[in-house]
Amino acid sequence: MAAVSLSVSTVKPLGDRVFVKVSESEEKTAGGILLPDTAKEKPQVGEVAQVGPGKRNEDGSRQAPEVGVGDKVLYSKYAGTDIKLGSDEYVLLSEKDILAVVN
């Protein structure tokens, strides 16, 4: 089996799925105490890196996604599948798990 090199440009979400680059979590508290990885909360904000073609309707047509590449989004805390590419963290989630677009 041939090895596949993954990068953001090679990942194309299917259906209504969205590939989001996770924002960095806080490294220390407001009081200056450094947090270990086990104490950090899972981030819920990220930037859309790739978008699928949209959900398929009953008549076979596609419903265009409401978010686009570059949008900053807020998503459900435990939604999606975590993926690490190099040193960057991503989450692949369904569009319904996106709660809001953040300006």
UniProtKB/Swiss-Prot annotation:
One of its GO terms (biological process) is chaperone cofactor-dependent protein refolding. GO terms for cellular component: cytoplasm. Pfam families: Cpn10. The keyword RNA-binding does not apply. Signal peptide: none annotated. Its main location: cytoplasm. GO terms for molecular function: ATP binding; metal ion binding; protein folding chaperone; protein-folding chaperone binding; unfolded protein binding. The keyword Chaperone applies. SUPFAM superfamilies: GroES-like (SSF50129). Gene3D superfamilies: GroES chaperonin. Keywords: Chaperone, Cytoplasm. It is found in: Cytoplasm. Belongs to the GroES chaperonin family. Heptamer of 7 subunits arranged in a ring. Interacts with the chaperonin GroEL. Together with the chaperonin GroEL, plays an essential role in assisting protein folding. The GroEL-GroES system forms a nano-cage that allows encapsulation of the non-native substrate proteins and provides a physical environment optimized to promote and accelerate protein folding. GroES binds to the apical surface of the GroEL ring, thereby capping the opening of the GroEL channel. PANTHER family: 10 KDA HEAT SHOCK PROTEIN, CO-CHAPERONIN GROES. This is Co-chaperonin GroES.
